Curated annotation (Swiss-Prot):
It is found in: Membrane. The keyword Oxidoreductase applies. The keyword Plastid does not apply. PROSITE patterns: CYTOCHROME_P450 (PS00086). Its cofactor is heme. It comes from the Eukaryota. Its EC number is 1.14.-.-. Keywords: Heme, Iron, Membrane, Metal-binding, Monooxygenase, Oxidoreductase, Transmembrane, Transmembrane helix. The gene is CYP71A25. It holds the Pfam family p450. This is Cytochrome P450 71A25. GO terms for cellular component: Golgi apparatus; Golgi cis cisterna; membrane. Heme binds at residue 431.
Amino acid sequence: MMMMIILLWSIIFMTILFLKKQLSGKKGKTPPSPPGLPLIGNLHQLGRHTHRSLCDLSRRYGPLMLLHLGRVPVLIVSSADMAQEILKTHDQAFANRPRSKLSQKLLYNNRDVASAPYGEYWRQMKSVCVIHLLSNKMVRSFRDVREEEITLMMAKIRKSSSLPFNVSKVLECLTNDVICRVALGRKYGGETDFKKLTDRLSELLGTFSIGSFVPWLAWVDWIRGWDAQLDKMGKDLDDFFEKVVQDHEDGDRRDGTDLIDALLRVKREKSPGFEIERVSIKAITLDVFVGGSDTSFTLLEWAMTELLRHPKSLNRLQEEVRTICKGKSRVSEDDIQGMKYLKAVIKEALRLHPPFPMMAPHESTEDVKLRDYHIPAGTQVMMNAWAIGREVATWGPDAEEFKPERHLDTSVDFRGQNFELLPFGAGRRICPAVSFAVVLNEVVLANLVHGFDWKLPEESKEDKTDVAESSGFSVHREFPLYAVASPYLT
């Protein structure tokens, strides 16, 4: 009985604090907010597919919407013009990243590039990535790796002998092997411990800490084993990357060409005023692997899904690729430049299916006025790239349809200058690996449609294959894509 009384008074007290916080301390007009519940605010409205739930809410409350996730104010952005105002007009004010228990435990206490706080360390690490890891010269240097792995993929598909096969698994294997060779120097694919490790990491990145939003419920994270999972995952990741770095140091790899070799060279050179630490090498390598592998796999899986659902688009793409590469056994990266419809297909797949529909959160470092709204320092900001890509005001009444043709007569691109297409972000925090991802995605997709005629298995033809999504930070198909590929005789 006494416990019930204590619990009741605790709830009443926390409710009073919640209402007091909501009604006081406002310096100006705030963006519209859906009604929340005491203590948890709007947490209950996120849903399994957060990007879809927030898109529905934004249609009612507007493209700039303020949620209260427990005690944390989060600004949700669902339109291109508001994204531009934040990522261009007020880019510096929103360039910070919020710290979280998850990023601290899994990303080396935010020593990577993606989650590092905005400041001198982040600027130095981004400079290392842009100059030494992801420059056009470095991207070109890995051409042989891409070509070799694509050749292996094509041979694997031919072995299916025109029977239904798991396209998703083949694409995941390809992107994993390419990124492993580029970043780590060799493959770590198949059913290895590393594969299990990365699968666990992907699952954890799609979760969140209840205690981070509602501190007095932090014990729930401990009870459900979330804290223990983070600790074990962080240790397992560090054990793996420490061994990889040590193997590189022990070998005679001063002329090595993978990304860890490049980072170790930077460490040895000890530039004046800057020295890269060992923990930073591991953190940046983890960034490259997680971002590069997951992004490319997700895009290719959805691109093939949409092409199989839209045979006319598939036929048009095949006609373009086979015309340009007439008489060739495969598509090379030199052939890609003139393939306008291929590039349109990639853009349309990214528009409808951005690999990370809710972009990594930003955080304001100062008070900002957005339109007529006051945004206090410390407010988190999340861009709903999925909603922006389906905005009717930008894309028209057919915004939900897969139509690559919409990109043929427009200069809209995904490299951060056009805010209606934001799969890689924009501004200071844009993904620095855009060029690497684009080259891989284009040449893989071109070879798939050049080398094979594709169709859905008979059992999938009625619904033209489903487009159900998985849940998590990156959004794949919920179920693997199966298809039939028949070798095309050139």
